[in-house]
Amino acid sequence: MTRIKRGFVARKRRKKVLNLTKGFRGSSSVLFRPANQRKMKALRFSYRDRRQRKRDLRSLWITRINSASRLYNLNYSQFVYKLKQLNIHINRKWLAQLAIRDYKVFDELIKTVF
């Protein structure tokens, strides 16, 4: 059986990890083992935070809708409840955008709710 040398494969694998960890602090961007550990942790964080971002944005939208609807003496839960009663289907992202960017349309929406 012939001998297989794998120096190239190992170097390529290590180089790939070090390229991913460019910009990390300390030895995490220079040495392979700490870089590999930081890479694995960074990937775990990114996986977790992709899910967390959805929750954060939803709560941000709700906060924006609540603050905009309180200008009309109506809190968020009452506003959403009345929208559902009137069978108006606008998601929270759109409502938040309307409250910030196009407040005239949001004003009309509030008037239809009353």
UniProtKB/Swiss-Prot annotation:
InterPro entries: Ribosomal_bL20 (IPR005813), RIBOSOMAL_L20_CS (IPR049946), Ribosomal_protein_bL20_C (IPR035566). Its main location: plastid. The keyword tRNA-binding does not apply. Disulfide bonds: none annotated. The keyword Chloroplast applies. GO terms for molecular function: rRNA binding; structural constituent of ribosome. GO terms for cellular component: chloroplast; ribonucleoprotein complex; ribosome. It is found in: Plastid, Chloroplast. GO terms for biological process: ribosomal large subunit assembly; translation. It comes from the Eukaryota. Coiled coil: none annotated. Keywords: Chloroplast, Plastid, Ribonucleoprotein, Ribosomal protein, RNA-binding, rRNA-binding. Gene3D superfamilies: 6.10.160.10, Ribosomal protein L20. PANTHER family: 39S RIBOSOMAL PROTEIN L20 (PTHR10986). Binds directly to 23S ribosomal RNA and is necessary for the in vitro assembly process of the 50S ribosomal subunit. It is not involved in the protein synthesizing functions of that subunit. Belongs to the bacterial ribosomal protein bL20 family. This is Large ribosomal subunit protein bL20c. It comes from Tupiella akineta (Green alga). The gene is rpl20.
